């Protein structure tokens, strides 16, 4: 699946789970937080799309997605990123 298609799938997943993805600019990598009781994931739109996708995959890998339908390519991507992080190989992505 192409990076832009993965990004679209992450946007759909975020809406389904009640999250908002904020595309910001600045000196930050990105991540999840709660802002005035809203669940948000902030990603840096100045970073390459691969890095933005990695941030989203990391955040969604922390959530219980067992009962949530994901297209197989998205679930596979989230699992791959999660496994790299667990193995301490996130710098090799």
Question: Residues of each region from the PLM?
Answer:
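Auxiliary, metal-adjacent structural segments of Zn-dependent hydrolase domains
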Residues: 1-29, 91-93
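Active-site scaffold of zinc-dependent metalloenzymes
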Residues: 25-50
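Catalytic Zn2+-binding segment of zinc metalloproteases
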Residues: 61-73
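Post-HExxH zinc-binding segment in Zn-dependent metallohydrolases
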Residues: 75-93
